[in-house]
Design a protein with these regions (language model features):
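Catalytic cores of TIM-barrel enzymes
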Residues: 1-371
Length: 371
């Protein structure tokens, strides 16, 4: 008898070997590509959670049903990313992919002292209001937008469960370190880390616990069990392993342990090269982290390091989904499946499925496990 998506997901988290390939879950991370595959314009996809749900229905009728689905629609992803954005139908053509624009929000490192004086919540609220287009002029506007975000998330997560799928996470957070990297901009932040990391460390240590507790409260209020951690600037692509060990890891480890104590699995979205950092995750409670790899990290080495400690997902390349053939996708998936049958593995795309992915290639990922 075929397993349900939730049964497959829980089997993966257990780290126990799979008895057969039907027990292994599959997750093609899709946001904008639901529109391109389902025939919905990107401008409509970004403007409406209902249109995004419609595009999911259309797409799974073509490619089949994955076990896991992203729970945040594109319009809300743009909002919660906390970067200025170019949006289809506004700055971009109607069917273009949305774009994030990274530029320094502050140019004087003394701003770190201002954050310490204001508090992280007040400062970040001010920042998010300023980057809207047009900028928000009062906190009520931001509160209304967060309320809309919550309503959309509830609607989307309810839909995902109604279809027998599992949402990738029930709520999400961006660690303060990574948010600071984006608001300061990568190059300037790297200089700050080398010249005077003290204020950055002070901000992280002082305010991260309260930020985590707020996220825990939101997720637990809705009976959630998973938190998405978008730790996108803590990899070896952006900082040295030494800086990771000295600055990032103590705070990140404490965060993950905090979520674990609250009964939440940490879904670590690990873009870029995490290979030098993965050994640290063996220090954590077994099975408390699920690591999503995008292809920049050697997945076989990652699996060898984390096997028996934490689960991983990956990593069919975006280029293969766009330009390859179903047979090439099937062969790549077969290699991953053979590796992952020892347990703790989810077959998935390497980060997001691209806008120009071929339907038959995305379908081949599901067929590799279910056909």
């Amino acid at each position: 008898m075929a397993k349900s998506s939730m049964e497959r997901y829980m089997k993966m988290l257990s780290l126990e070997p799979f008895a057969d390939r039907d027990e292994m879950p599959v997750f093609q991370m899709m946001l904008a590509s639901f529109g391109s595959l389902g025939g919905v314009l990107q401008t409509d996809l970004c403007a409406s959670a209902d249109k995004w749900i419609e595009s999911i229905v259309r797409t799974i009728s073509i490619i089949g049903k994955p076990d896991v689905c992203m729970p945040v629609c594109p319009g809300d992803t743009i909002f919660i990313m906390q970067l200025p954005a170019r949006i289809p139908g506004r700055e971009l053509p109607d069917d273009s992919l949305y774009q994030f624009v990274e530029k320094p929000y502050f140019t004087d490192p003394s701003e770190y002292q201002r954050i310490l004086q204001m508090g992280w919540e007040a400062w970040s609220m001010q920042y998010v209001m300023s980057i809207q287009n047009p900028p928000y002029t009062n906190p009520g506007q931001l509160g209304a937008r967060f309320a809309e975000f919550g309503a959309n998330a509830g609607k989307t997560i309810g839909f995902i469960y109604s279809q027998g799928m599992v949402p990738d996470f029930d709520g999400a957070c961006a660690p303060i370190f990574d948010t600071l990297s984006m608001t300061r901009s990568m190059a300037d932040f790297a200089v700050d880390l080398m010249l005077d990391p003290g204020p950055i460390v002070d901000i992280m240590r002082r305010f991260q616990p309260a930020a985590d507790e707020a996220t825990i409260g939101q997720i637990k209020a809705n009976n959630g069990t998973r938190v998405g951690g978008f730790v996108m600037r803590s990899s070896a692509t952006f900082i040295s392993p030494t800086l990771f060990e000295e600055i990032v890891w103590p705070v990140l480890k404490a965060s993950i342990e905090r979520f674990h104590a609250a009964g939440l699995t940490y879904i670590l979205h690990a873009d870029a090269n995490w290979l030098p950092m993965l050994k640290y995750f063996t220090e954590l409670p077994r099975g408390c982290v699920h690591v999503e790899l995008d292809g920049s990290t050697d997945i076989e080495q990652a699996y060898d390091i984390l096997r028996g400690y934490q689960s991983i997902r990956g990593d069919v390349p975006a280029t293969m989904l766009a330009y390859g053939t179903p047979d090439e996708v099937a062969d790549y998936c077969e290699k991953l499946i053979r590796m992952g049958m020892k347990g703790g593995f989810m077959l998935g795309s390497g980060c997001e499925v691209p806008l120009n992915a071929k339907a038959e290639n995305v379908k081949a990922m599901i067929d590799a496990l279910r056909a």
